[in-house]
Each structure stands twice: as structure tokens, then as C-alpha cells.
């Protein structure tokens, strides 16, 4: 169990500092195997971008090939946004066994199965929480279906390999959605929120809470009420909650809930609560199918106007006594199940009407050590996908306290693979953070026909190697076709084993074909002489 107090300390938390120090020994051994001699281990960070299931699979391919080439052992930090967090977290739940991890991935997409009943049970359980939000629904009923996984382990379970230094230190990114206006206006660093096996919090403020107490209630820096540590399924939903078209999805949630009034349930009466649950969630899970407006919900069977159903359901369900609600069913167990289901429907409808995501207790509430009143006056935080700010977690590895020398940025975007570089350049310029400066015209030129690797260097700060997934070296002239095949909002049901294997192979090839370039930059940051290709601050490699 972690500390029950809030920590406000500039710099690295002591647990991370110790883990990184232990990791240095493993990095030095790995460099020696790669024939790179160094007195000090350089700090290398690997970043995985967002991109839904495409990013999940491609990131696994990258990690697998880096392990195969002996490169992963030379990495100090692994950081991810959205879909990449699903892959990175899997690395730790499998104790770093990439062969087993890859085999498991292929198996999941061979059988095309998903445990609806278990996901239903987890969602109903989550709906009993005072902080239930659409993130819970998204995590247990959408992301679990996309990944074919429902992990019940926790971030704190990852401590052992991290503290022993056998695996890189992982950082999972989110942003505080309530601070989006500050981000839009000034790219405020405190917008970014991070999760590690030890802590969760705002790195820009140096304000953290033990990961085991993330979600618990604090006041004035003290623990008031303990809540169980959230499982990885929920966190994956939080980290991967960026949506393509919020208005379309909001309307679809409403459309589905309108069909689930008491009237609708009684008319479609099913033999038991379990089958009712299947009926409800089979309809709710069409949320993704209509996220692009391709499959509009059907009219109600009775021909009644759909636009009044949600309001009617919420009002009637609130007013009707529990006894009357359950009158048609005499089985006590069935009564309880039905009540829980309808409570879930009601709560989901309310969250959808408010579009409420990522609700959790604010551990900085009434904290005297925080001068920013916005941070300390809120009872709740609303944490969402960091890809809504920058689709790669550069802001979490750039602080000087982490002393990163080399960044390997793997971009799994379906669109412009340099948008993350543009956004990070702007962020760093505003806050005087060392980062290679690239001219907009050059980025525009690169984006028209991306190569597989770009090396960006500035006078100070880390060297950045940027690897677009879809590039002319691997895809030839078919980049657009590849992008269409692996669309961000493509359902997992369309991912056959062949489609998965092809994407894994593409991601691996990008690492393998650029191994020499990576080794060269490792030599450079390790302090060894190696001839430079160019004196330019940014060069294509």
C-alpha cells in the first residue's frame, strides 16, 4: 500500500528515481552487447502515439522487434498515449515476454470472441460508484471488445520488474479535460496527467498521489475515504477515450437508451436478467458502428417518436417506486439484476446528457500547498485521452528532471505523421523547453511522402528520432490504402488474423530497417565519436 498523503515535490518521485537508477545497470549491459561502450548510461525514451487498435497492434510490433534486436534493453522509459498504452501495459502484465504477448494477440484475433457477460458484470459494478462516467462504459463495453481483453490487474502490480530494473519505466498519459481551455489558449503544462506503477498526478506541478490511492477521496492533502485501486481495463478506457465525432456518438448513446425504457423492456420481456442484459448491451455496443453515421438506429417497433424516450425513461424511472418497477418479476434474484441494469441505464443516460468522462476525486482538493485555486477548488477531476492535446506523450518525457537524451518517437497516426512534431514544437517554444525546431515548410514537404525515419537535432535538448508507421519505404505508393485498411475507428470484428499479422510485420520492419540509424544515435548520446551525416539541426536519415 502506498502513502496515504499527497506528495508535492519538484523533480522525480523517490520511487521512480530508484527504479531509473537500477535500470541504468541493465542499460549499460545492453549497450555492451550492442558493442557500444559507455561510462554512463544515456537515458532513452520510446514513445508510442495514439491510433486506437492500429496503434495497439503496431506498438506491440515495435516493442517485439526492439526486443529481438536487443534495443529494448537499452531503453529507460516507455511512454504512451491512447492505443499505445494498451500495448505497453500488456508488456508488463506478461512480464516482458514478447513471444507470449505476440502469440496471445494472434490468438485473441483468431477466435474472434469477447466475454459479454463478464464485461456486463464489470460495467454494472462500476455503475454503483458515485464517480461513474462514460469512461467506465467505454472501458468495459467498448475497449475490452476492441482488444478482446478484460485485464483485472493493476498498475501497482508492475512494480517488481520496474524496481528491479529488468523493464523500462512506463509512463501512461492522460490530460485534465477541465483544463482544456488553458491548453487551447496557452498550452498549459499542468493540463498533462501521468500514471506510473508508483504514482498518478501532475508532473508540471510535482503533485502526485500513490497509484494505489488514485480515485480515493482526499481533502487538505489527507486521505478521507479509500476506494479500491482501479483495474487496468478501466485505465485503458481512460487513456484511450478520444472519440472521432462526439456529437454523433452522443446522439447514438441517446438513441440506444431511448429504446431501453421500462415500456420497451416489458414489451421485449426476456426470460431472465442475463438475457435482458445481452439485449441491452447488444444494442449499446452498436455505438461504434454508428460513430461515422453509417448505421442510423432503427425506429421503435411501435412507431412512436424516438426523441421523447430518453427523457421519459429517466423521469419515469426516478418517480416509480422500486416495488412497481419490479412487479412483473417475482424471482428476487431477477429483481435485483433488473434493478441494477436499469440503474446502469439511468446513470449512463445522465452521463451522456452531460457528456461526462473520466470522473475521479481530486486529490488536490483544498490542498494548501497548491497556489492555483482552480486546481485546489475542484472536488473532481475529469481525465481523458491525452491525444486530444498531443497524440504522443512528448510533454511527459521532456522535463529536465527526467534527463532524456534520445527519444524514439513511433507515430501510428492515420493522418499527418508530423502533426505531433508540429504540436510539440509549438508547446516547447511557448515554454522555452529545448526541442529541435523544424520549419513548417519542411514538415509540409515531408508529410507528402513520409520516409521511415527522421532524425531531429537541436543545439540543446534530446535528439528525436521520428518513425511514421505508414511510409514510402515500407508502403511504397500505397500509403493511403494502408491507412484506409487500418482506420482508427475500425471495429475489431474486421481485424482478421491476416490483417493483424500484416500490421505487426510492417511495424517490425520499420524498426529492423532503421536499426543502424538507432545504433548510431545511441553511440552519439553515449558520448562516442561518430561521423555526422550533416551539420543541419534537422536532417533526414
Swiss-Prot record:
Q: Does Ribonucleoprotein appear among the keywords?
A: no
A single GO cellular-component term from the record reads:
nucleoplasm
Q: In which tissues is it expressed?
A: Highly expressed in heart and skeletal muscle.
Q: Which reaction does it catalyse?
A: a 1,2-diacyl-sn-glycero-3-phosphocholine + H2O = a 1-acyl-sn-glycero-3-phosphocholine + a fatty acid + H(+); a 1-O-alkyl-2-acyl-sn-glycero-3-phosphocholine + H2O = a 1-O-alkyl-sn-glycero-3-phosphocholine + a fatty acid + H(+); 1,2-dihexadecanoyl-sn-glycero-3-phosphocholine + H2O = 1-hexadecanoyl-sn-glycero-3-phosphocholine + hexadecanoate + H(+); 1-hexadecanoyl-2-(9Z-octadecenoyl)-sn-glycero-3-phosphocholine + H2O = 1-hexadecanoyl-sn-glycero-3-phosphocholine + (9Z)-octadecenoate + H(+)
Q: Which residues carry this modification: Phosphoserine?
A: 337
Q: Which cysteines are joined by disulfide bonds?
A: none
The reported effect of residue 402 to A is: Abolishes enzyme activity. Reduces lipid droplet formation
Activity regulation remarks: Not regulated by calcium, coenzyme A or ATP. Lysophospholipase activity is inhibited by palmitoyl-CoA. Lysophospholipase and O-acyltransferase activities are inhibited by methylarachidonoylfluorophosphonate. Lysophospholipase activity is inhibited by phosphatidate or lysophosphatidate. O-acyltransferase activity is up-regulated at low concentration (10-20 uM) of phosphatidate or lysophosphatidate, but inhibited at higher concentrations.
Q: Where in the cell is it found?
A: Cell membrane; Endoplasmic reticulum membrane; Mitochondrion membrane; Lipid droplet
Outcome after substituting residue 54 to A: Abolishes enzyme activity. Reduces lipid droplet formation
Instruction: Please report the propeptide residues according to the UniProt annotation.
Output: 539-541
Query: What terms describe the molecular function in GO for this protein?
Result: calcium ion binding; calcium-dependent phospholipase A2 activity; calcium-dependent phospholipid binding; calcium-independent phospholipase A2 activity; lysophospholipase activity; O-acyltransferase activity; phospholipase A1 activity; phospholipid binding
Segments forming domain PLA2c: 1-541
Task: Give residue numbers for the modification (Cysteine methyl ester).
Answer: 538
Annotated lipid attachment (S-farnesyl cysteine): 538
Regarding the membrane, this protein is recorded as: Lipid-anchor
- Key words, A-Z: Cell membrane, Endoplasmic reticulum, Host-virus interaction, Hydrolase, Lipid droplet, Lipid metabolism, Lipoprotein, Membrane, Methylation, Mitochondrion, Phospholipid metabolism, Phosphoprotein, Prenylation, Transferase
According to the record, the residues making up region (Required for lipid droplet localization) are: 260-292
Hydrolase is among the record's keywords: yes
Provide the induction entry.
(Microbial infection) Up-regulated by HCV. (Microbial infection) Transcriptionally up-regulated by HTLV-1 Tax.
Entry EC number(s): 3.1.1.4, 3.1.1.5, 2.3.1.-
GO-annotated biological processes: arachidonate metabolic process; glycerophospholipid catabolic process; inflammatory response; intracellular signal transduction; lipid droplet formation; parturition; phosphatidylcholine acyl-chain remodeling; phosphatidylethanolamine acyl-chain remodeling
Functionally, this protein is described as follows: Calcium-independent phospholipase, lysophospholipase and O-acyltransferase involved in phospholipid remodeling with implications in endoplasmic reticulum membrane homeostasis and lipid droplet biogenesis. Preferentially hydrolyzes the ester bond of the fatty acyl group attached at the sn-2 position of phospholipids with choline and ethanolamine head groups, producing lysophospholipids that are used in deacylation-reacylation cycles.
Quaternary structure (record)? (Microbial infection) Interacts with HCV non-structural protein 4B/NS4B; this interaction likely initiates the recruitment of replication complexes to lipid droplets.
What is the protein's given name?
Answer: Cytosolic phospholipase A2 gamma
Instruction: Name the gene behind this protein.
Output: PLA2G4C
